[in-house]
Amino acid sequence: MIDGVMVKQLRVLPDERGRLMEILREDDEIYPRFGQVYLTTGYPGVVKAWHYHKVQFDHFCVVKGMMKVVLYDSRDGSPTKGEVNEFFLGEHRPIVLRIPPLVYHGFKTIGGEEAFLINVCTQTYRYDAPDRKSVV
């Protein structure tokens, strides 16, 4: 696995009323600090890629549908430079995926329905100076 990437398996607690699933807690080893939470979606078969952040950690959790998330480590000096990781996240694999700064990432919705991804990131989005480098 790419250096700095972490996976947290999530527990789903079902009962006769429905389900509860904790995503992140303040005391999780995987989670260094709070910046903001946002929801992004992907339509079936659509790819959103490639970009990285200079400072920000992302924590992806797909809560509806399924997505394939791909990571690429291009960091100079990283013991895993050049490594590619693929993860499947969603209703059938409830995990949080931590993506460290400077690791390229993108995702594709798989299956026949729109997928919902929650990201709990460590930086607040700055519209005047985004911490985001995209490959076009």
Which residues does each predicted region cover?
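Non-catalytic, conserved peripheral segments adjacent to functional cores
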Residues: 1-93, 110-134
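Short beta-strand His + acidic residue motifs that chelate non-heme Fe in jelly-roll/DSBH
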Residues: 97, 105-110
